[in-house]
Amino acid sequence: MALEKSLVLLPLLVLILLVLGWVQPSLGKESRAKKFQRQHVDSDSSPSSSSTYCNQMMRRRNMTQGRCKPVNTFVHEPLVDVQNVCFQEKVTCKNGQGNCYKSNSSMRITDCRLTNGSRYPNCAYRTSPKERHIIVACEGSPYVPVHFDASVEDST
């Protein structure tokens, strides 16, 4: 009797373990939309000419762990305004994909570029505040930015 119960419960246990193994890795994984927000949206501050802004933000936003991310752009606009770019002018992405959008108006941004000779773990960045149109790749439901593609000057 005990053996029969074990044989019935064994497949159920195997099924539960398979489901947990499949679901668990995605539980702690950051979504592409959340990663975009972490890496590119800084609504709480305005563009800073402080030479330490990029050094601090790149560390704070975990972009200097294991390597120095060479280039990054922070957008200093409300998150909803950045998300709304997904419904503005459709443009072709740098990689040829068709899911990029250009902001209708220029936005306040800060470009961070790794300085020449800077090596991990001592990542040092040059800070450049600007006002430019942003181009982002969007996907998902809701349709939101998942990749910062470029910034461009006003063409007027």
From Swiss-Prot:
It holds the Pfam family RnaseA. Residues 1-28 form the signal peptide. One of its GO terms (molecular function) is ribonuclease A activity. Substrate binds at residues 35, 38, 69-73, 94, 113. Residues 33-43 have a biased composition (Basic and acidic residues). Its EC number is 4.6.1.18. One of its GO terms (biological process) is defense response to Gram-positive bacterium. Residues 33-53 are annotated as: Disordered. Monomer. Interacts with and forms tight 1:1 complexes with RNH1. Dimerization of two such complexes may occur. Interaction with RNH1 inhibits this protein. This is Ribonuclease pancreatic. It comes from Pan troglodytes.
